[in-house]
Amino acid sequence: MKFLLQIVTVSAGMVALCSCQTSPKAVDYYQLGNEMEEAAKNKRVSRTFESFIASPTYRTSRDFWRGGALREYNPAESHVEILLEMQRGRLYINGKIAMDFPVSTGTKDQHDTPCGTFRITEKKREHHSSLYGSFVDAQGDVVKSKVHSSDKAPAGSRFQGTLMEYWMRFNGAIGMHTGKIEREAESHGCVRIPPEACSILFDKLAIGSKVIVK
């Protein structure tokens, strides 16, 4: 049976806006499935995963790929791989590639994202960082951004951790969450993922699902 393989292009501006100010749009899997079935019946031209990753712009693009396996649901047999060199992530369901998406991991200094095999230990729709964020006043307006919780707060202000939606903790303080994607490793160790892709991961993975960083 043939499936339509979808590619969604996410612009830099949209990623920055969605990761910080708006809630990601929910994915309607039934609608997605119907669209894929209809496209298959119409014999539309599909792009295979192999051709997607063979593209010369694969390493630098913000495109992501979705396959027919995305309609399946089996958290016990689902896992995600984070590819540090290529700054890409891949979701597997029942041993089949379901989605490939861009990520931004930790910088290659004291904030690197450690390699290894881990398990998701916590999931939260909305999570606030306990380390990084902004100082805000009594009205909640930002006084100073991009600060560490240990920094001295200006008079009358307090620390407010950065919002990290679709949070999935897998290695101590490190987790996967929505965030700005610049196609380079630039986080404090976490794995930043575009909102739409991250919401899908949140739905398809569970506590105990495997995360492989390599």
Enumerate the predicted regions with their spans.
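Sec-dependent signal peptide hydrophobic core
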Residues: 5-12
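N-terminal pre-domains immediately preceding structured catalytic cores
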Residues: 2-5, 19-214
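Bacterial Sec-type N-terminal signal peptides, specifically the leucine/valine-rich hydrophobic h-region
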Residues: 14-17
